[in-house]
């Protein structure tokens, strides 16, 4: 029988294999102060102020007095001052440049930039949207050479252009208005305190750019829950019987309720019965 030697005992100097290094879970240090670039990024406000007049949706525009884009039309706006909030800056710039006191519904539209929108460098703009029921006569001030209410059609259709990226901001503001009046009472923000159904219909026609059937619109508007409240008064509008006057229900703002059912705009490809697209001649013609 062969002799089997036992395995040699391990040397006292032998070390066990070192464990694999654990993956690092340490987070990079968090900066305690804003980066230097934050102090160099100007913040501006721009205002899309809309109203309805002469059967057309109009926007308040200024002609720029200074470069860049001197002499070009633009939306009212300017830079945020130290300690100023963006809504306050929007009201201040609108009043300074146009003399128009913001009346109606003002809301934040969206933020634009900062790269590529201003030839002077990166600028972040917080755009606001104003729905005005009163066509105040504007008066140029600040760095505005002139100011006017202009139909939105030429700018939306590409026949005219605004300074900076204001074509895009205007288009976004108009689309916001078109969408919101389907589901909210926002169209009443363009109306006086008391209005007829015909006046309200003309607001929808101007904002949507579409002719609506008067009877269908009257039926839908008066049956939409929480939309209108009859005042019990009437107003004569020429030939025919006087028209009933309506208002928003007391305590309800222009966006406080959701219309049930909504007043949906006709599709651009397949207009509903009694609706047709408005042409340039329609926009130029008084209501």
Question: What would you call each of these model-derived segments?
Answer:
Residues 6-9, 127-130, 138-181, 190-198, ...:
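NUDIX/MutT-family hydrolases
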Residues 41-45, 58, 87-91, 95-154, ...:
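Active-site segment of metal-dependent pyrophosphate-handling enzymes
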Residues 2-13, 24-46:
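Acidic, metal-coordinating catalytic segment for phosphate/diphosphate chemistry
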């Amino acid at each position: 029988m062969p002799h089997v030697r036992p395995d040699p005992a391990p040397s006292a100097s032998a070390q066990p294999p070192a464990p694999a290094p654990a993956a690092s879970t340490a987070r990079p240090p968090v900066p305690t102060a804003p980066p230097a670039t934050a102090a160099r990024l100007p913040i501006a406000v721009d205002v899309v102020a809309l109203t309805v007049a002469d059967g057309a949706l109009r926007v308040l525009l200024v002609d720029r007095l200074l470069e860049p884009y001197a002499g070009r039309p633009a939306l009212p706006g300017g830079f945020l001052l130290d300690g100023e909030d963006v809504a306050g800056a929007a009201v201040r710039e609108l009043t300074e440049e146009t003399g128009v006191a913001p009346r109606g519904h003002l809301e934040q539209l969206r933020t634009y930039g900062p790269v590529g929108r201003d030839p002077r460098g990166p600028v972040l703009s917080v755009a606001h949207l104003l729905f005005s029921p009163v066509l105040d006569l504007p008066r140029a001030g600040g760095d505005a050479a002139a100011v006017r209410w202009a139909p939105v059609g030429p700018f939306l259709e590409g026949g005219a252009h605004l300074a900076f990226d204001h074509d895009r901001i205007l288009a976004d503001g108009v689309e916001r208005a078109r969408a919101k009046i389907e589901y909210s009472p926002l169209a009443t923000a363009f109306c006086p305190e008391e209005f007829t159904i015909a006046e309200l219909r003309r607001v929808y026609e101007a904002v949507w750019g579409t002719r609506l059937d008067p009877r269908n619109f009257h039926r839908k508007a008066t049956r939409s829950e929480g939309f209108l409240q009859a005042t019990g008064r009437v107003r004569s509008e020429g030939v025919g019987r006087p028209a009933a006057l309506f208002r928003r229900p007391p305590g309800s703002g222009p966006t406080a309720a959701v219309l049930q059912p909504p007043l949906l705009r006709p599709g651009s490809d397949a207009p509903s019965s009694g609706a047709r697209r408005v042409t340039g001649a329609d926009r130029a013609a008084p209501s």
